[in-house]
Amino acid sequence: MRICFVVIKNLSKLIKAKGLSTSVGDEGGFAPMISSNNQALDLIVSAIKKSGFINGKDVSICLDVAANELYKKSKYSIHSKSYISVDKSIKEYKKIIKKYKIKSIEDPFAENDWLAWNKLMKSIKKVQIVGDDLYLSLIHI
């Protein structure tokens, strides 16, 4: 708990130093207006370092993508308003996993996109994949 508190406190300071809002979203996470996912992850990594910890050793970054909100006509909007294919999405996840030492990804694809889940599970082995919406929304399974 102490580690989380210190990292979150430093993350708040870094966000404020950039002149961004430290307002929080529905689930308690910061929701600054930033230009990219990488910018958000860079801020988190900086906060981890500023707190005296090592990303991937002392602290693990986990993502809750909530991909149901990013899904339209078998494509995903991961970076912007443009949509990319499942294969390109998986490539992006792999880049992010490597660069930021991601340990877990929750809801990386829409709950009904079985092909995407299957492809991801076959191609990413060392990261925990969590299907929150997949299981909680599909109670008939």
Report the location of each language-model feature.
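Metal-dependent enolase-superfamily TIM-barrel catalytic cores that perform enediolate-based chemistry
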Residues: M1-V127, L134-L136
